[in-house]
Amino acid sequence: MLYYPHIDPVAFRLGPLKVHWYGLMYLVGFAMAWGLALYRARDPKRHWTAQQVGDLIFYGALGLIIGGRLGYMLFYDFSNFIANPLTLFQVWRGGMSFHGGLIGVIVTTWIFSRRTHKRWMDVTDFVVPLVPLGLAAGRIGNFINGELWGRVTTVPWGMVFPNAGPLPRHPSQLYEFLLEGVLLFIVIWWFSAKLRPRFAVSSLFLLCYGLFRFTAEFFRQPDPQLGFVAFGWLTRGQELSLPMIIIGGFALWWAYRHKER
């Protein structure tokens, strides 16, 4: 059994301003995405400029933050949102949803593609390899905050988290760091290193993230305000990941069936 290391969630202070590790992880994620995008843009076959990369990161960040927060309120805290809609803007209280962020990024990349006269599917194929390392950084932020812990376990690496009772739990944030962050990055970066059929990279991302998240949810404690949403075992995260698996699998088949490259 391991004990949570009790990391101070505040990274440093600038006078009265507290800079939290979780916020820094978002900055790290965006910085890594920007760097990877600039690296990929150096390939003349991809037809991207540094200016377009900078604009894309801005659009992506906007969609992620707005969609992530709105998605959390709608998917995970709807009753509180209806009772007090202003909680949407209380971001300091925490609460971000990957699936909401995904929808937000879909919308903003579509707007970006319209303004730059690029095909939306080409834009998403360029974007998705940049995402997993940002997800990895976010899960490290969750771990530092001591939140989103796992279910009670007897495995040797079970960890006692503050505010989660005396029993050891799966460090599910680290499982998601490895699955949705490291492993997903390796798979998507390798797959996207060569030009693939249009939307194949995006489809594989949807499929793999959905599978990895669905698996990780078996070790993660369900949100207390929701519990299991169906069958006595299905969580909201699994419910939202199922469409990703189905759509991703079908879209990957479609991409290779209708090759445009």
Swiss-Prot record:
<keyword id="KW-0472">Membrane</keyword>
<keyword id="KW-0808">Transferase</keyword>
<keyword id="KW-1133">Transmembrane helix</keyword>
<feature type="transmembrane region" description="Helical">
    <location>
        <begin position="173"/>
        <end position="193"/>
    </location>
</feature>
<comment type="function">
    <text>Catalyzes the transfer of the diacylglyceryl group from phosphatidylglycerol to the sulfhydryl group of the N-terminal cysteine of a prolipoprotein, the first step in the formation of mature lipoproteins.</text>
</comment>
<keyword id="KW-0997">Cell inner membrane</keyword>
<keyword id="KW-0812">Transmembrane</keyword>
<dbReference type="InterPro" id="IPR001640">
    <property type="entry name" value="Lgt"/>
</dbReference>
<protein>
    <recommendedName>
        <fullName>Phosphatidylglycerol--prolipoprotein diacylglyceryl transferase</fullName>
        <ecNumber>2.5.1.145</ecNumber>
    </recommendedName>
</protein>
<dbReference type="Pfam" id="PF01790">
    <property type="entry name" value="LGT"/>
</dbReference>
<feature type="binding site">
    <location>
        <position position="139"/>
    </location>
    <ligand>
        <name>a 1,2-diacyl-sn-glycero-3-phospho-(1'-sn-glycerol)</name>
    </ligand>
</feature>
<feature type="transmembrane region" description="Helical">
    <location>
        <begin position="56"/>
        <end position="76"/>
    </location>
</feature>
<feature type="transmembrane region" description="Helical">
    <location>
        <begin position="227"/>
        <end position="247"/>
    </location>
</feature>
<feature type="transmembrane region" description="Helical">
    <location>
        <begin position="19"/>
        <end position="39"/>
    </location>
</feature>
<feature type="transmembrane region" description="Helical">
    <location>
        <begin position="92"/>
        <end position="112"/>
    </location>
</feature>
<keyword id="KW-1003">Cell membrane</keyword>
<dbReference type="GO" id="GO:0005886">
    <property type="term" value="C:plasma membrane"/>
</dbReference>
<dbReference type="GO" id="GO:0042158">
    <property type="term" value="P:lipoprotein biosynthetic process"/>
</dbReference>
<feature type="transmembrane region" description="Helical">
    <location>
        <begin position="199"/>
        <end position="219"/>
    </location>
</feature>
<comment type="pathway">
    <text>Protein modification; lipoprotein biosynthesis (diacylglyceryl transfer).</text>
</comment>
<feature type="transmembrane region" description="Helical">
    <location>
        <begin position="126"/>
        <end position="146"/>
    </location>
</feature>
<comment type="similarity">
    <text>Belongs to the Lgt family.</text>
</comment>
<dbReference type="GO" id="GO:0008961">
    <property type="term" value="F:phosphatidylglycerol-prolipoprotein diacylglyceryl transferase activity"/>
</dbReference>
